[in-house]
A protein has these predicted regions:
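Hydrophobic/aromatic residues in alpha-helical transmembrane segments
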Residues: 23, 39, 76, 117-118, ...
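Small-residue-rich hydrophobic transmembrane alpha-helices
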Residues: 52-112, 149-168, 275-338, 370-393, ...
């Protein structure tokens, strides 16, 4: 590996580097949002309301599976970035190949679990009986792409750790275009309906994963993959699982807790439920753009921790936080300014638009503040600390929200009292995360006269 590539995150002007690193991630995340919207549009327009309802009823379950893989990949990126920063090529090589085996194992486990228990999971999630057959079919076909998705998240983690966020974007774009073409072919041409949309997703996920794996094999970089060396290295399994499993668990539980919020929304009339669904389309626009800066934070902190550069760790956190907050504030301002136009994309019913304005305003004023929670968690992970931040976010953003639904919301019974749980939980969680990060920062950087601890 060349020194230029290895030190890309450990030298240079941080404000420019973090922005350039994050822009391809932002594009990738927004592409995923648009491709998901395309899936919904195709099935809704050409297969009818029942098919759309079947696919829509799987959203939470799909998020649990994909979120777990995404969290696992985030842990891989942190450890790889640290070894890159420390120029520890032997440990990096072993981590790369052990990560590949573990990622594939998780993908196969998700596939097997979903194939066997999708009907049970969907019933537990309250899927309507008339939608259940289509939802089960969608899940079983969609989950065939889990090993491919695991490969993509592994490859994305390795390239991102090395500062190369453009390569995953290229393959994601190609896979997204393939997904749309296959959607149209399977749903319109072959009339496969729900199965067609799921098959298109599974094939495109597998294609993107295999392409990214091939790119790692032919890269010739220290973080690349050598097929003959693909094996588990026992000494790397524990550090990887310690970093990856809490992040995967956090994502899974986080999406599970959203069921209780949805139950609160469902207690209102159909207009409010539809309004919530329309306004909720703003969430990924804000969250996914912010997530790019949080990924950057973890990678920059991780590499500079490996390099023993205390000041760049501090600045990486502060600059990433400023970008995340600032960009989200701009998105929120646009949503508040053009709220009716935005909601009009998803519904033409004036009553639904009017009801959706409430959620859009409450959430629009809340989005930027989540940066203090998520970016701080990313910084702690960059320092190799995952269990503490995970426990805090599970208590603050999951357990607290469930308690809020059954106490504050139950008492006031208004939609605003339900939506306010987001910003309150973010403030509480962020406060504890910041205190914990400051402690981690001082603990971890105090050892820089020695070799950084990676376990």
């Amino acid at each position: 590996m060349t020194a230029k590539k290895t030190n890309e995150l450990t030298s240079g002007r941080l404000s420019v580097q973090i922005l350039l690193y994050s822009l391809p991630l932002i594009a990738s995340n927004l592409l995923q949002v648009m491709f998901n919207m395309a899936d919904v549009a195709v099935i809704g327009q050409f297969s009818g309301t029942a098919a759309l309802g079947s696919v829509g009823s799987t959203t939470t379950l799909v998020n649990i599976f994909t979120g777990s893989l995404l969290g696992f990949g985030g842990g891989i990126s942190v450890l790889a970035a640290r070894y890159l920063g420390a120029h520890d090529w032997k440990d990096l090589h072993e981590t790369t190949h052990t990560s590949l085996v573990l990622s594939l194992a998780l993908g196969v486990f998700a596939l097997a679990l979903g194939q066997g228990f999708s009907p049970l999971f969907l019933r537990l999630l309250g899927t309507k009986p008339e939608l259940l057959p289509g939802a089960v079919l969608y899940m079983r076909v969609y989950l065939l792409g889990m090993p491919g998705a695991a490969l993509f998240n592994f490859g994305n983690a390795m390239f991102s750790a090395a500062g190369n966020t453009k390569k995953p974007l290229q393959y994601l774009t190609a896979a997204g275009i393939l997904n749309i073409v296959l959607n149209l072919f399977f749903v319109i041409g072959l009339r496969w309906g729900v199965a067609g949309v799921a098959a298109a997703s599974a094939i495109s996920q597998t294609a993107s994963g295999l392409l990214l794996l091939r790119a790692l094999i032919v890269s010739g970089e220290e973080y690349g993959v050598t097929p003959a060396h693909i094996r588990l290295t026992r000494s790397k399994v524990s550090p990887l699982l310690w970093l990856c499993l809490p992040a995967a668990l956090q994502n899974a539980v986080f999406y599970t807790s959203s069921l209780f919020v949805q139950a609160g929304v469902n207690s209102f009339d159909a207009t409010m439920v539809a309004a919530n669904a329309a306004a909720a389309n703003a969430d990924p626009l804000a969250y996914d753009v912010m997530a790019a800066f949080h990924t950057a934070c973890a990678s920059f902190v991780g590499q500079n921790y490996g390099a023993g550069n205390k000041e760049r760790i501090r600045k990486s956190y502060h600059i990433s936080l400023a970008y995340s907050f600032g960009v989200s504030a701009c998105i929120s301002a646009l949503l508040l300014l053009f709220h009716r136009q935005f909601l009009g994309i998803f519904t033409s019913d004036p009553a639904v638009v009017q009801a959706g304005v409430t959620r859009l305003f409450v959430m629009g004023l809340s989005y930027p503040w989540s940066a203090f929670m998520d970016c701080t968690i990313a910084a702690s992970r960059g320092l190799g600390k995952t269990m503490g931040p995970t426990v805090i976010v599970l208590l603050g953003s999951c357990v607290f929200r469930i308690i809020w639904v059954y106490t504050i919301f139950a008492y006031f019974g208004t939609i605003v009292s339900l939506y306010l749980l987001y910003i309150v939980s973010w403030f509480i969680t962020a406060a504890f995360e910041i205190v914990m990060y400051r402690r981690y920062f001082h603990e971890q950087t105090s050892i820089f006269k020695k070799k950084p601890v990676v376990a």
